[in-house]
């Protein structure tokens, strides 16, 4: 059993992008920015508990940070982890209506 405190730390934010929006509309899949140490089981449990929906699958990937320049200095953005969460048919998560 995963502790409730850990579940609240797993999902950092929804990832809003053109690809994510199309995925949500066509394949009932939501995209989240998650903690780098989060496992698929933790992500599934967190989504089910926080949004009260049934999850059918979780796919994760590590996004590498881009190299960016500010004047003459060269910096690098942080790496982060992204999760594609598939929901059962008919389930939906409404981020706009969330408070």
From Swiss-Prot:
This is Large ribosomal subunit protein uL23. The lineage of its organism: Bacteria, Pseudomonadati, Pseudomonadota, Gammaproteobacteria, Alteromonadales. It holds the Pfam family Ribosomal_L23. It comes from Psychromonas ingrahamii (strain DSM 17664 / CCUG 51855 / 37). One of the early assembly proteins it binds 23S rRNA. One of the proteins that surrounds the polypeptide exit tunnel on the outside of the ribosome. Forms the main docking site for trigger factor binding to the ribosome. Part of the 50S ribosomal subunit. Contacts protein L29, and trigger factor when it is bound to the ribosome. Belongs to the universal ribosomal protein uL23 family. Gene3D superfamilies: 3.30.70.330. GO terms for molecular function: rRNA binding; structural constituent of ribosome. GO terms for cellular component: ribonucleoprotein complex; ribosome. It comes from the Bacteria. One of its GO terms (biological process) is translation. Keywords: Ribonucleoprotein, Ribosomal protein, RNA-binding, rRNA-binding. NCBIfam families: PRK05738.1-1, PRK05738.1-3, PRK05738.2-4, PRK05738.3-2.
């Amino acid at each position: 059993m995963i502790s409730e405190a850990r579940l609240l730390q797993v999902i950092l934010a929804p990832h809003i992008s053109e690809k994510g929006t199309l995925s949500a509309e066509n394949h009932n899949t939501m995209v989240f920015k998650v903690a780098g140490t989060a496992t698929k089981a933790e992500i599934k449990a967190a989504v089910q508990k926080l949004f009260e929906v049934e999850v059918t699958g979780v796919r994760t990937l590590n996004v590498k940070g881009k190299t960016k320049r500010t004047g003459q200095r060269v910096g690098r953005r942080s790496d982060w982890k992204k999760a594609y969460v598939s929901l059962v048919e008919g389930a939906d998560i409404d981020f706009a209506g969330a408070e």
